[in-house]
Amino acid sequence: LLPEAGTVLVEGMDTRNEDHLYDVRQKVGMVFQNPDNQIVATIVEEDVAFAPENLGVPPEEIRTRIDEAMKLAGIYEKREAAPYKLSGGQKQRVAIAGVIAMRPDCLVMDESTAMLDPHGRAQVMKTIRQLRAAGITIVSITHYMEEAAQADRVLVMSRGRIVMEGTPEQVFSQTERLHGYHLDVPQAAELRDELVKAGIPMPENVITPDACAEELYKLLK
């Protein structure tokens, strides 16, 4: 996808320049909403190997890459399984493994938990935290505010423009403004606001259940 106006640079490379497309695709990997649209093989490890093979990676290195990717995505024990037998969360982790086998610097998750049940979402979020700990940059596009609250940095977009930006605590302390953009806030932040309305003092940076419980414990001591 190319910009209709302006310029998009990926590590200094203009995405409009066709000479850069191969390098850009190696820098950034993408995981979509529906893993069934991203899985192409009949065996998990064959699917994870698909992208490195297309990139011309030597066979011996492909074996190393797919093993590392499956372990990092938490799907190694299912390496010989047929994808259609997996749960939604497991399929999404196969899709993630297939992308990180290309060893991109950045992974873009486009509503990657939207089609999953709560258990599947929890599986994928655990994998995202592991990838972040491994040094991979994660850009997650989501309407689930509980997921956004786990990020290092949050950007709110409206009509194609960034309208809010900051840490989760900075962004989710502005409940009314977020509601103005038709967005919810994490449940812990909603509870914080209701407690404040009831006359119970709560810090604005309370946006997670643990932080909320800690502040309530302080009040009860």
Give a label for each model feature.
Residues 7-23:
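ABC ATPase NBD Q-loop/coupling interface
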Residues 60-78:
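Conserved ABC ATPase "signature" region
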Residues 82-86, 90:
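Conserved ABC ATPase signature
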Residues 103:
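Conserved catalytic motifs of ABC-family nucleotide-binding domains
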Residues 107-110:
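Catalytic Walker B motif of ABC-type/P-loop ATPase nucleotide-binding domains
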Residues 178-221:
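ABC ATPase nucleotide-binding domains
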